[in-house]
Amino acid sequence: MTNLLSRAICLVCLIGSLIAPAFAQDYPQKTVRLISPIPAGGAPDLIARAVGHRLAQIWPQPVVIENKIGSNGQLAADYVTHVAPDGYTLLVGMDSLFVINPYLYKQSAVDVNKDLIPIATLGTNQFVLSINANLPVKNLPEFVDYAKKSKPALAYASGGNGSQHHLTMELLKSRAGIDLMHVPYKGGTAATTATIGGDTVAMFSGTSNAALIKAGKLRAIAVSGVNRSKVLPDVPTVAEFYPGFDNTIWIGLFAPRGTPDAIVQRLRRDVARVLASPELIEAFANAGGIEPFSTTPDEMQRLIKRDQAKYNKLISELKLKID
C-alpha cells in the first residue's frame, strides 16, 4: 500500500511538472492589466505604458494600464495583493513602496516579502544634484567646501519629508560631512521653483529637469548613480568624488503571491526581450532619461533587501516617521 501511494504521488508530481510549462506557453489567453500607483505621466506610468505596448505585440493579447492612486502608492499595491494570482493583474511599482514606506509610515499595508512576487525590474533613473545658477560654485567639491564654510547652514529643497530626493541629499550630507538645512515642499515642481528662485540653493531631482539645466536656470554638479547619465553626460557622478555612492530610483513588475512560477518565468523572459528592443530604449530615453534595467526575480529580491537595509538605517538615524 505504501509503495502504491508513493507511486501515485510521483505520478501526480510528474503530471504537474508537465502541465506547468504548457500552462505558461498558453499564457496569456486574455487581457493583462498593469496597475500603476501614480497618475498618468509619472515614471511608473510611462514605463508601464511603454512595456505594456510591446508585450501586447509579443503575445498578442491586450495590455491595459490602470491608475489606482492614493496612500503613497499603497492603494495600488494592496489592490494587487487581493486579486487572483493568475498573472492577469500585475503591479508596476516604484522601489519606494517597498524599501522606504515600510520604515517611514506608521502603517504600511503591503509587505513585499509576504504579499507579492518580484518578477523583474523594468527601468531606473538617476537623481541630479542641481544648485541655484547664481551660487558661486561650479562643481561638487566646491559646493561641499562652500557648504562647510557657510553660516548659517545652506538650505536645500526636496519634494517632501521622506521623499527619495530628501533621502539622497541626506546620504550625501553624511558622506561629505556637511550640514544643510532641509526645506520640504509639496512636490518636486515646488522644490524646483524654490531652487531656481533662490529660496533654497540646492536639490536632488530627476533627470526630467535636464531642460532647465541646459537652459541655465539650474546648474547640475553631480548625478547619483554609478555611471554618468546619458541625458547629462558631462555631469560627473557623486561616486567620482565619494567612491561607492549610489542611490537611484528603480521601477519593477510584481505579481500577487501565489502566482505560478511558470507564469512568473514566462513574464520575466518576455520582459527581458522587450527591454532589449531599440524601440523601448528610445521610448524610455524620451520619457525623462529612464534607462532599461532588467533583472531576474532572484536578483530583484536581493536588490530589495539591499535597499531596505540602506533606507531602514537612514530613516532610523533621521528619526523620520509619518502618520
Regions found by a protein language model. Give the residues of each.
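N-terminal secretory signal peptides that target proteins for export/translocation
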Residues: 1-5
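Bacterial N-terminal signal peptides
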Residues: 8-20
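N-terminal (or domain-start) structured segment
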Residues: 23-114, 153-155, 161, 177-207, ...
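An extracytoplasmic/periplasmic, membrane-proximal ligand-sensing/linker region
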Residues: 29-31, 175, 214, 261-323
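Hinge/capping helix and adjacent helix->loop/strand transition within the periplasmic-binding protein
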Residues: 82-88, 103-190, 238, 243, ...
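Short secondary-structure boundary segments
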Residues: 94-95, 133, 206-208, 225, ...
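Anionic-ligand binding region
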Residues: 190-245
